[in-house]
UniProtKB/Swiss-Prot annotation:
GO terms for cellular component: small ribosomal subunit. Belongs to the universal ribosomal protein uS4 family. PANTHER family: 30S 40S RIBOSOMAL PROTEIN, SMALL RIBOSOMAL SUBUNIT PROTEIN US4M. InterPro entries: Ribosomal_uS4, Ribosomal_uS4_bac-type, Ribosomal_uS4_CS, Ribosomal_uS4_N, S4_RNA-bd, S4_RNA-bd_sf. The gene is rpsD. The lineage of its organism: Bacteria, Bacillati, Bacillota, Clostridia, Thermoanaerobacterales. Pfam families: Ribosomal_S4, S4. This is Small ribosomal subunit protein uS4. Signal peptide: none annotated. SMART domains: Ribosomal_S4, S4. It comes from the Bacteria. Residues 98-161 form the S4 RNA-binding domain. Keywords: Ribonucleoprotein, Ribosomal protein, RNA-binding, rRNA-binding. One of its GO terms (molecular function) is structural constituent of ribosome. One of the primary rRNA binding proteins, it binds directly to 16S rRNA where it nucleates assembly of the body of the 30S subunit. With S5 and S12 plays an important role in translational accuracy.
Amino acid sequence: MARYTDARCRLCRREGTKLYLKGDRCYSPRCAVDRRPAPPGQHTPSRRKVTEFGIQLREKQKVRRIYGVLESQFRNYFHKAERQPGVTGENLLRLLELRLDNVIYRLGLGASRAEARQLVRHGHFKVNGRKVDIPSYQVRVGDVIAVRERSKGLTRIQELLDRASENNPPAWLEYDGERAVARVVALPTRENIDIPVREQLVVELYSR
């Protein structure tokens, strides 16, 4: 599968805001957006006035990059959100939030969504007692997510378990740090999806 392999900090600088793609580094003085807020490039030109289409495109790219999905995947999520009842933009964010890799990140079991995605691919988690190694797997209300027993002895997993025990997950997730088990207790609402995007602009872009 195709994936982005260039420096992730360039993406944040391109969007002009932190997308929190590098985990702990994004909260440190080493963050590229704090050090060099101008767009990437040799001459780092100042940001020019953009058209309405350009604004919508940048917002779509921002959402796509935050969750780490390809354009074709993102378009499929949008069409699925369109078919669901309710507000399309909120439906889109909900579908992205319910990806297994994002849930692992929200639980604190990955320092970034990229790390969470890698851990899922390596088969470190179970959903309802069965190993799931598909990052895009859609969890549902009532699903139980757990770290596999054979993975708990790994140094990095132990570090993340300690991290998760101090993490404050969103209201739609419950986490038992002693057992390293989480449960999806509700569907995420826009109020508890804390990403700095204007999803309505994405809807307007795809509605052109």
